């Protein structure tokens, strides 16, 4: 992000809350978003977060989450400049420890207990079933740009998944169905001195809660249905919906969850490649990840 633009956004936010300009320290910066801790002359601190599309809906999601009683950082002010969103919010401080599986279970149970938010995008059964077709569309656009030309295996895998999607997607609206955080990882559960808070709602939507549960352990390792089953059982024991353990689409719940989560991730990676990032230099990094995830999808969804 252009430094002058981020400075202008921060100036706008400070004006809204009646504070002088603070000192800034980066916490983490990505290509389309960033997080900073800002310290005001009186010693008080806040978190300054900025993002552009498709991460520019987070303020809306945070407000909806707060209205429903979810533990999220308090939002003090928001501003828009040149299609960039700026937010000033509570500084929760340094976590006292990393979140573990039980923290993730507790967060998921609370998230899934609140009523769905009508202002969030919807990903129901039809939306899930459309993901492989959307990914094929992304592949076609990439090929028209003379990129991803040696990816016939990706096309074949997506075709198989698309053909089976109508059957495998069955059960998508079984409980838990509602809030989906979509970036649900241990780093999104902040465990502080005053309890835990959920962070990073930029891509929240309404859909199958199993997508979140399947995302918690990340995507860098080979997906483990056994580990996923244990996590689902912990979730139900902690008060989560019993149907989280129910078979869906002719598959065990854990295979369904992991398979559709990986398919959701594949479509997102390919959309980034052609639309949001759109940098051919990054294709050598994206293609192997997509191949690996598609191999997992084919195996997990048994297509």
Segments from the language model and where they lie:
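Conserved N-terminal boundary motif of the eukaryotic protein kinase catalytic domain
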Residues: 17-26
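Active-site acidic catalytic loop and adjacent metal/ATP-binding pocket
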Residues: 28-40, 166-211
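A generic structural signal for beta-strand entry/edge sites
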Residues: 33, 83-86, 190, 195, ...
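A glycine-centered beta->alpha junction motif in the catalytic cores
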Residues: 81-99, 141-145, 263-283
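Glycine-rich, phosphate-binding/catalytic loops in enzymes
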Residues: 105-106, 197, 214-216
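Active-site activation/catalytic loop segments of kinase-like enzymes and analogous catalytic loops
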Residues: 210-243, 259-282, 293-295
């Amino acid at each position: 992000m252009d430094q002058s633009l981020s400075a202008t956004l921060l100036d706008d936010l400070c004006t809204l809350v009646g504070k002088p300009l603070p000192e800034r320290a980066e916490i983490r910066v990505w290509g389309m978003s960033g997080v900073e801790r800002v310290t005001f002359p009186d010693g008080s601190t806040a978190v300054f977060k900025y993002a552009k599309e498709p991460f520019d809906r987070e303020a809306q999601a945070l407000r909806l989450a707060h209205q429903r009683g979810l533990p999220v950082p308090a939002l003090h002010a928001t501003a828009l400049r040149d299609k960039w969103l700026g937010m000033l919010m509570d500084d929760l401080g340094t976590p006292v420890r990393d979140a573990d599986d039980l923290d993730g279970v507790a967060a998921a149970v609370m998230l899934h207990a609140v009523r769905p938010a009508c202002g969030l995008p919807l990903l129901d059964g039809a939306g899930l079933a459309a993901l492989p077709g959307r990914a094929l569309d992304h592949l076609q656009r990439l090929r028209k740009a003379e990129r991803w030309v040696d990816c016939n295996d990706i096309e074949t895998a997506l075709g198989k998944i698309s053909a089976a999607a109508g059957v495998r997607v069955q059960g998508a609206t079984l409980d838990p169905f509602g809030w989906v955080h979509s970036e649900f990882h241990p780093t999104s559960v902040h465990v502080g001195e005053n309890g835990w808070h959920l962070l990073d709602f930029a891509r929240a939507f309404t859909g199958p809660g199993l997508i979140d549960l399947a995302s918690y352990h990340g995507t860098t390792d080979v997906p483990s249905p056994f580990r996923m089953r244990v996590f689902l059982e912990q979730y139900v024991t902690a008060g989560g919906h019993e149907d989280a353990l129910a078979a869906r689409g002719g598959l065990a719940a854990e295979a369904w969850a992991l398979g559709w989560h990986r398919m959701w991730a594949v479509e997102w990676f390919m959309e980034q490649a052609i639309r949001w990032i759109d940098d051919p230099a990054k294709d050598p990094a994206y293609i192997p990840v997509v191949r690996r995830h598609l191999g997992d999808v084919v195996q997990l969804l048994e297509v």
